[in-house]
Amino acid sequence: MTIALGIDTGGTYTDAALVDLASGDVLSAAKALTTYHDLTVGIGEAVARALDHGGCRPDQVAMVGLSTTLATNAIVEGRGGRVCLLLIGYDPELIQQYGFQADLAAEDVVYLRGGHDGAGNEVAPLDEAGAREAVLKRRGQVEAFAISGYFAVRNPEHERRVRALVEQLMPPIEGHPFPVTCGHELTSRLNSVRRAMTAALNARLIPILRDLIATARRTLDGLGVTAPLMVVRGDGSLVRAEWAMRRPIETVLSGPAASVVGARHLAGQAHAWVIDIGGTTTDIAALRDGRPRVNLDGAQVGRWRTMVEAVDVHTVGLGGDSEVTADVEGRLTIGPRRVAPLCMLAAEHPGMVDVLRDQLGASSPPPYAGQFALALCDGAPGLAEADRRLLRELAAGPVPLAVLHGSWRHGPLAVRRLEGLEARRLVLRSAFTPTDALHVLGRFRRWDVEAAGLGAEVLARILGTSPEALCRQIVEQVSQKAATELVHKLLGDEGVEVRWADEPTARALLDRALGRVPGSDLACRLRLRRPIVAIGAPAEAYIPRAAEYLGARCVVPPHAEVANAVGAVVGGVVLRRRVLIRPLGAKRFRLHLPEGVEEFDSVEVAVARAQEAVPPVLREQARQAGAEQVEIDMARRDQTAPVGGGWGRRIYLGTELEFIAVGRPSVGVTKPQRHRGHRENREILRKTS
C-alpha cells in the first residue's frame, strides 16, 4: 500500500484525503475551515483529522499533494513581491503610445537595447552594461527579477545572458540563486506584451508561494509527515514543490484543475461535464478523453490574460454559503457574496438565537435583520481609527448589523466600513444561506437547526411567504442557477456569445426549460449529450436537480465532498516543450530550440536534430519536477498554405514539434517508526485546533 495525502485549500474549507495510490481507494477524508490569516492552521487541522480518521501513522504517508488558490487570489487582489521587469529590445515609445504600460504587471520597468526578429536574428547587441547597472541599482530593493526579450521565443540568447548576469550580481536566497523569471521558459507562443506580463506576474508570486510551501512544510513536519511535497498546476498535473516555487504562475487555477482530476478518478468518467459546488463558488469544466480541457489561449485571472495554459473553467459566485437576500422588489437573490451560515456561527455563539428571536418579535424587521458580523483578527497595518474601533467592537462575538446600523457611534456608514473590512478578510459576515435552508428542510443537520429556522422566519416575513416555501425556493433556485451557468459555459465553448439580457426570447425559452415559468403553456426540454459529475460538499443537494433540467445523467461519486483533495494526488507529472522549424529562403531551415537556434539544409534533418536534443533535456526536467518512469511522445504539425493558381501546390510555412513527458510522481520511502496511535493523532489535532 502506497499512501498519499491530498490537501486542497478552498474558499471556505480546507480538505484533506488519504488515498491508496495502488488501489485508488480513498482511505479517509476530513475538512477544516480555511484560515485566511494563516492557511497552515486550516491545513494542520484537516491533515490531523484525516490521519486520525484513517488510523494512519504520519510516517506511512509516501507523498503529499497540495492544490491551492493562493496564486490565483494573489493576482486578483494585486498582491505579490517587489519585482523589476527587464525588457530587452522593446520600444518604450510604442508601449506608451498604445497604453501597454498598464498591461506589464510591474511598476519598475527597465528598457534595455537588444532583442531579435521573428526569424531569431539579432537586431541589436545586448546592452550588458545597462543591464548590469539596472541590477546593481536594485540590490536590496527587489525580491525577484522578470526578463522578457523581444522575440525571445525565437532566440532566447539575450534572456539567458541577462539571467546569468542577475544570478552573478544578486546574492543567493537560502542557498538558492536569486529568483529570476525568463519569458521563454513560461511560453513558446508569440505576444511580447502578454509574455512580459506573465513573466512579471510569475516573479511577483515567487515570494508568496515560497512562504506558503515553507510554512506548509513546517506544518507537515510538525505532524510527523516528512514525505515529498507536490503541488498541482493549473492543467491538473503535479510538480515538486521546489519546481512550483520557481514557476508559481503555473499554479493558477490549481484548485479547479484538481477538482476535475479528482472527479475523473472518483467517477470513472472520461467524457463529462464537472460541476464543483463548494461553499463560495461553483466551478464548471469539461473532461475530454479523461483529461481536463485546457484553455490554450492562457488562463484569465482577474483582469490579466496570462500565457499559462490551464484548465478551461467557468466560475460563478454560487455555493452553499452564498448570501440569500431580498431586493427592493421582493425578489430573492442568492450570492455572489460568501457569508457564514447562521446555523454554523450560532453553533459556536448560541447568543445569536436570542437576537434572532428578538428581531422576530419586533413589529417590523429592523434593517439588516438576520445578519451579524464578527472580527477575525485584532487589526492590520494601515487601518483608519474608525475601522480599528469597529474591529474592537466586533471582537467579543457576533454583533447584529441592525445594532451597528443604528449605533450613534458608527451610524449608517458602519455597514460600508464593514464591507471594506470584509474585503480584507478581517471581518466575517453571517446571514441566511442555502446551507441554512437545507437545515430547515431536514436535508442537512450538522449545526444549529433553531438558528437556521429563525433566520428563515425573518427572511420569509420580509418576503411574505412561509419559511418552508422560502427554503424550497432557495434550493430550487440554486439548482436552476447551476444549470443556467452550465448552458452558458457550453454555448461559449461552441462559439456562441451568450448575452441573456440582450436576447429576451432565448432567455424566455431557457426559463421555461428550467421550470421558472410553471404556468406557461409552452414546455421546453434540453438534453445534454454528456453526463454531469457533481462534486463538492453540497453537490448531492443541488446538482442532480440541475441535471434533470438539462436531461443529463448525474453522477455523484463517493467522497465527492473531497474530490479536490483526491485530485491533488492522483494526477501525473506532465511537462511539454514546443520547438519550431521555420524556412530561411528556399533551401535553409532554422530550428528554434529553447537553448538557441540551429540551421539545416532540410526539414527532416532539423526534425531529427530536435528529436535528439529535446528528449534528454525534457526527461531531466521531468525528473526535477518529481517524475519517475518518464515516457516522452512527440506530435508533429506541418504548416502549409495553398499557392494561388498553383494547380493544388502548397508552400511550406513551418513545423511545430510538441514533446510531452509523462511520468508518475516519485514517492518517498516510508521508514518504520514507532506506531503513533489514534490517541496521539487526536493530541496533534487538539494542539492544531
Where are the regions that the model predicts?
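N-terminally biased helix-coil "hinge/interface" segments that flank
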Residues: 1-672
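Short, low-complexity, charge-dense intrinsically disordered segments
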Residues: 671-689
